[in-house]
C-alpha cells in the first residue's frame, strides 16, 4: 500500500508578474480550481488550498475546496506549508505534497509519484521531479529552472542559469543544445515530511535562495538531500506570465 499523504496548494494573490493569478479565469473556472481538481484525482487523502487572501478563500468555498487562510508575511510557499501543517496538526512523519497554485495542468500521476518517491527514499528530506530539456531556448530562459543531480538521483544544485555550462560548445554556438549533456528542467512539485517544514522555517532564507529566488536552495544550503526523478508524465509549463495564461487558455479551449 502506498503511503498516505496530504496535498497543499499554496495560492498567493499578490503575484509580481501576474496579479491575482490564482483567480484568473481559464475555461470558466479560476486557475486554482483547475489545480485543485487535478490534485483531487490523485491518491491524496486530503487536498487543502492555503492562501493569504480572503478573495481566494471565498472562491475556493464556491467550488467546495478545503481552504485555510494563512499569514501574509511568508517568504515562500514552503513557509506557508509549515503553517498549514501546524494548523492541521500533522505528525512529524506525515508526507505533504506541495502542488503549486499556478500549475493548472499538473498530472495527478506525478503527485502520486513524488509522494511515493519520498516515502521510499528515507535519506532525502524532499522529493521532486524533472524532465529533459530539448530546446535551447528553454535552457537559456531564466523562468525555466534547471537541476543537476548526482548518480544516486540526489540534487547537486538548482539554478535559473544553464547547468552545466558547456564551455567549449557554447564558445562556438549557443543556438543548439550541446551533444551528450543531460539538461533537465525542474518541475515545481515537492513532497516533504511535516517535521522538515518546521526546520525549513526555523533556518530562514539564505543568500543563495534570495539570489536565485528558488526556495529549494534553502534546503540544500542546510545540508538536506533532495531526491530528483524524471516525471512519469511531463506536465505543461505553469503560469508565470500573461503569455503563459493565454497558452493554457488555448490548451483548455477557453
From Swiss-Prot:
GO terms for biological process: CMP-keto-3-deoxy-D-manno-octulosonic acid biosynthetic process; lipopolysaccharide biosynthetic process. It is found in: Cytoplasm. It comes from the Bacteria. Disulfide bonds: none annotated. Its EC number is 2.7.7.38. Belongs to the KdsB family. Activates KDO (a required 8-carbon sugar) for incorporation into bacterial lipopolysaccharide in Gram-negative bacteria. This is 3-deoxy-manno-octulosonate cytidylyltransferase. The gene is kdsB.
Amino acid at each position: 500500500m502506498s503511503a498516505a499523504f496530504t496535498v497543499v496548494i499554496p495560492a498567493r494573490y499578490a503575484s509580481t508578474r501576474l496579479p491575482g493569478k490564482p483567480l484568473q479565469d481559464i475555461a470558466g473556472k479560476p486557475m486554482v480550481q483547475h489545480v485543485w481538481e487535478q490534485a483531487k484525482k490523485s491518491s491524496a487523502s486530503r487536498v487543502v488550498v492555503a492562501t493569504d487572501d480572503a478573495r481566494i478563500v471565498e472562491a475556493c468555498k464556491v467550488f467546495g475546496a478545503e481552504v485555510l487562510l494563512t499569514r501574509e508575511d511568508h517568504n515562500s510557499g514552503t513557509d506557508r506549508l509549515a503553517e498549514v501543517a501546524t494548523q492541521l496538526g500533522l505528525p512529524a512523519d506525515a508526507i505533504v505534497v506541495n502542488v503549486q497554485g499556478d500549475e493548472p495542468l499538473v498530472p495527478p500521476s506525478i503527485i502520486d509519484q513524488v509522494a511515493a518517491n519520498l516515502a521510499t527514499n528515507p535519506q532525502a528530506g524532499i522529493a521532486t521531479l524533472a524532465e529533459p530539456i530539448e530546446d535551447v531556448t528553454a535552457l537559456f530562459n531564466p523562468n525555466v529552472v534547471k537541476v543537476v543531480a548526482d548518480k544516486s538521483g540526489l540534487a547537486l544544485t538548482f539554478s535559473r542559469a544553464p547547468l552545466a555550462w558547456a564551455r567549449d560548445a557554447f564558445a562556438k554556438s549557443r543556438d543548439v543544445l550541446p551533444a551528450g549533456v543531460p539538461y533537465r528542467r525542474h518541475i515545481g512539485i515537492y513532497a516533504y515530511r511535516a517535521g522538515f517544514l518546521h526546520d525549513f522555517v526555523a533556518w530562514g532564507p539564505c543568500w543563495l535562495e534570495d539570489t536565485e529566488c528558488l526556495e529549494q536552495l534553502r534546503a540544500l544550503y542546510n545540508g538536506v538531500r533532495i531526491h530528483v526523478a524524471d516525471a512519469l508524465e511531463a506536465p505543461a509549463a505553469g503560469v508565470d506570465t500573461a503569455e503563459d495564461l493565454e497558452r493554457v487558455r488555448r490548451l483548455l479551449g477557453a
